[in-house]
Amino acid sequence: MIVDERMTAFINSLDTGNTRILDAVEREALDSYVPIIRKEMQSFLKLLLAMNRPKRILEVGTAVGFSSILMAEYAPKDCKIVTIENYEKRIPIARANFVRAGKEKQIALLEGDAADVLKTLNEPFDLIFMDAAKGQYIHFMPDILRLLKTGGTLVSDNVLQDGDIIESHYAVTRRNRTIYKRM
């Protein structure tokens, strides 16, 4: 983590916790080694949602639907969320989680490669949350910027890769070098 531990502790101290369904989905994801957003990002998203009150949210990278459900829980009730996922094994899990959370009408999951799906979208979004293959973000950016409403908010999770991105190429562990190069 590149954020000072005291800052992380402070951010976490402000968080009021999650709903039962979010706690359950988080626990199941972590037990299955499915990456989901960290507590700090959860708190940050809740703050952004409270401040900006978006009506339309785009998420790139659904996984098991944790972030989508979190945003649906804390965004205005009339907010619509569109989320994109390419990994076939996670799509049915995400859909089931949306139903469990009672958010299946608020969240639309689009299946496919984000680079292709983004090109098919036309309506602007108030908030775009990117949490997919970090090395692909540069390829998504023209469509992301086209879809982001003027004055909208773009959030990209983990773009600093725990600080690796600011390190020398040689200081980055071998398994992280491909992501490092692409970013």
Model regions and ranges:
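A short alpha-helical cap/connector motif
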Residues: M1-F129, K134-V155, V159-M183
